[in-house]
Amino acid sequence: MFARLCPVSETFGRLCPVSETFARLCPVSETFARLCPVSETFARLCPVSETFGRLCPVSEMFGRLSPVSETFGRLCPVSETFGRLCPVSEMFARLCPVSETFGRLSPVSEMFGRLCPVSEMFGRLCPVSEMFGRLCPVIT
């Protein structure tokens, strides 16, 4: 599903078994890595409109990461990890029926959770919290 958006072997790619799914988000090393100005990073995940975008009308939501303050945030108690990606505390959350896949990030161990030692990969992108927290100077 999230699979081969392109090659992010430098950032998202090393999420362990995720290296085959989230891994290829394009040159995300330049996009996802800079989740500060997310409006310019996550939004340009390539033709994400065909993969990431179709999480629902996510193509309209995920694509508009400018007002990220309405999506990334409420993934459950993710508000402490994924949620603090800036004012992202309200964006990632409403991916529609995504509440069944991405939305259950509480037991992340079922979906996004198996990023393995995410604390070593996803977590060290800057200091967002403890897991997704360090995505650059993403002012928490």
UniProtKB/Swiss-Prot annotation:
User: What domain of life is recorded for the organism?
Assistant: Eukaryota
The alphabetical list of record keywords is: Repeat
Region described as 14 X 10 AA tandem repeats of [MT]-F-[AG]-R-L-[CS]-P-V-[SI]-[ET]: spans on this chain: 1-140
Q: Where are the sequence repeats?
A: 1-10, 11-20, 21-30, 31-40, 41-50, 51-60, 61-70, 71-80, 81-90, 91-100, 101-110, 111-120, 121-130, 131-140
Name listed for the protein in its UniProt record: Putative uncharacterized protein FLJ45035
The species this protein belongs to is Homo sapiens (Human)
